[in-house]
Amino acid sequence: MLHVSMVGCGAIGRGVLELLKSDPDVVFDVVIVPEHTMDEARGAVSALAPRARVATHLDDQRPDLLVECAGHHALEEHIVPALERGIPCMVVSVGALSEPGMAERLEAAARRGGTQVQLLSGAIGAIDALAAARVGGLDEVIYTGRKPARAWTGTPAEQLFDLEALTEATVIFEGTARDAARLYPKNANVAATVSLAGLGLDRTAVKLLADPHAVENVHHVEARGAFGGFELTMRGKPLAANPKTSALTVFSVVRALGNRAHAVSI
């Protein structure tokens, strides 16, 4: 039985709790949320994980695993301290590692605690193939992300374009994965994940598009190197509760927790 604490109880966190509520091998003990959302979170947690308590911090709890489903801010506040205490962690908000020094802080904290932090693949596949290809040498990795125009509401794209007036797919960003994750942190976790598995944040090319006709989040990865080459296109349906997030992100967390808890993993 795997005892899990989770940071976050938004669309991703609730989706994870819902899918694992009947799994006897995964038990949620603590769900960590900001103080101003505790009442709302208690309602969801009582229905989906009645054995768990809602708190603002992990305090002296020592779960088998701490999983982050809360956004970039949670890494500094919750994940780094947990790693330093020797608690293994999983991270959904991989885009946070584009912030200067964050990747180094996570690694240093894990080393001090003698533990490990796992970066989850989220909405993209073939991360294992890309990471394996890096061993032999990669020459080029290009990531293109296409989302419904409304998914870019509240981002810098809204200041540059009239998203509601778009009539065709429009490139809203073209540059490095580091800049994509910095400018579009809630939309560019995939770009950061692809880059960290492959050529790195500064050598991975990224193009982001707002498409008024799109009903899915489309992720396309091209990679070439000593291994040969591959192209991957994924069409992910967004979460109903959060159009900025692919439903596959929730499923990737559930799979990762199952791999830790179950007798056989793949």
Curated annotation (Swiss-Prot):
The enzyme's E.C. designation: 1.4.1.21
Stored Pfam families: Asp_DH_C, NAD_binding_3
Pathway entry: Cofactor biosynthesis; NAD(+) biosynthesis; iminoaspartate from L-aspartate (dehydrogenase route): step 1/1
Binding-site list for NAD(+): 123, 189
Transmembrane segments: none
GO biological process, one term: NAD biosynthetic process
Reactions performed catalytically: L-aspartate + NADP(+) + H2O = oxaloacetate + NH4(+) + NADPH + H(+); L-aspartate + NAD(+) + H2O = oxaloacetate + NH4(+) + NADH + H(+)
Signal peptide residue numbers: none
Catalytic center residues: 219
GO molecular function, one term: NAD binding
UniProt keyword annotations, A-Z: NAD, NADP, Oxidoreductase, Pyridine nucleotide biosynthesis
Domain of life: Bacteria
InterPro entries according to UniProt: Asp/hSer_DH_NAD-bd, Asp_DH, Asp_DH_prok, L-Asp_DH, NAD(P)-bd_dom_sf
HAMAP family assigned to the protein according to its UniProt record, in alphabetical order: NadX
Other notes: The iminoaspartate product is unstable in aqueous solution and can decompose to oxaloacetate and ammonia.
NCBIfam families (alphabetical): PRK13303.1-2, PRK13303.1-3
Function: Specifically catalyzes the NAD or NADP-dependent dehydrogenation of L-aspartate to iminoaspartate.
Family: Belongs to the L-aspartate dehydrogenase family.
Name of this chain's protein: L-aspartate dehydrogenase
Lineage, opening ranks: Bacteria, Pseudomonadati, Pseudomonadota, Betaproteobacteria, Burkholderiales
Gene name of the encoded protein: nadX
